[in-house]
Amino acid sequence: MPSPNVYTVPQSTSALMMSSNTELTKTSIELDVLGARLKLAVMYRPGEGAPVLFLHGFGSTKEDYADVVLNQAFDGRPIIAYDAPGCGETECADLNAVSIPFLVETARHLLAHFAVVDFHVVGHSMGGLTALMLADAEPTRVLSFINIEGNVAPEDCFLSRQIADFPAENAELFFENFIERTWRSRYHSSALYAASLRHKVRAAVVRGIFTSMVELSDHGDLMRRFLSLPCPRMFMHGEQNDGLSYLSNLQENGVRVARVRSCGHFPMYSNPVEMWSLIADFFRFPDE
């Protein structure tokens, strides 16, 4: 549990997670994370039991997970999702501060704001890596972890490593070129994803996020961290990424591996029905 000396939990906030309301509520929450002021765009639903924290990937927003309310497996369960700093509707006073460690601290501060002790977590791509680092730092708080193509090895940096492979004169030019390359990718839903990037991400955060993702993937011992977690885990990947070298290793070490058909890196765009079915099945039987 976060120390009360570090995080101040408003008494009125903790009650939000115990209401009987079943709809998602949108709100803004002001936080100070590592000296940077945030106005975090949050969607949440109260309920009974430990909440599910949803962390979106780079270039996406909290709305990737809004359909959770349509899934009966989550009826009555508290839900928390938000736009990461530099993404969506969240406002961040210092975009240059944003990195994976910064995103981990953002998650910890928001959990403290809602007085959350333990929780389930679902993270995609950048959000999966954020969730992994959070779970590694506080393993007793994480009840289960669904990692949707979040980084666990150097080979996972096919997007983020472009910050080194395709240098540009400035952040805006790199981002424009990145969008064009992504639009032309042969992976499912890449053009759809690329078309909204300008609206969902500030160019100024790209370098900090991508550089930290590459650094952690190359030198952060991520596979050991993931396999060492004591909670039930699932790794979800798209059919086009069947060639990931570590899938059998995950299975041999007790991680449930789930494959989404007709999908690359973005199951929430390519095959959301199957993605939600797999997520729901895991929450019903997490230890199988």
Go through the PLM ranges and name each one:
Residues L34, L38, M43-E89:
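Conserved HGGG/HGGXW glycine-rich cap/lid loop of the alpha/beta-hydrolase fold
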Residues D156-F158, E172-S228:
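Conserved alpha/beta-hydrolase catalytic His-Asp/Glu region
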Residues V33-A36, D75, I80-V122, M126, ...:
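Active-site loop/oxyanion-hole signature of alpha/beta-hydrolase fold enzymes
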